């Protein structure tokens, strides 16, 4: 398997596409694992690109720094599950949810345009879990319920998606606390 693009190759690609592309989405894994991300984003911004960051919220201080430096135009943060099921859903037994909670609070303060999103898996998310997420992130922020899509990259073949009507029911549960809910991937 070939390694990913080197930073200089990525920047060369972006230089050639100025005026064609509007923005860059930095995704992962978890992009905030990389401590040198701000330098790369700064160069992207100098080229005139908008920058969106996809994150799981595990590194609130790094997120705050990037936002504070004006390097992010949009943040999409995954909410894996209700607080009580977060560790199991993330697949990390000793998962500490406090950093995620701090990132949620920071984004909800309105420091940068953002969305929350949850990829909904039948075996991991119940209606009660979805309701608890709604109580946690209650407000007018955009929240997307994304339908799970089985693939070769998902190690547990027993996982499955909810149907469209079921997803609509879950969205209705959320709308009491989070009116700006939309469905993706159906």
Kindly label every feature range from the protein language model.
Residues 1-9:
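Canonical Radical SAM [4Fe-4S] cluster-binding loop centered on the CxxxCxxC motif
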Residues 11-23, 32-165:
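Conserved AdoMet/S-adenosylmethionine-binding subsite of the radical SAM
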Residues 29:
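Short, charge-patterned binding micro-sites
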Residues 168-186:
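A C-terminal junction/extension of Radical SAM enzymes
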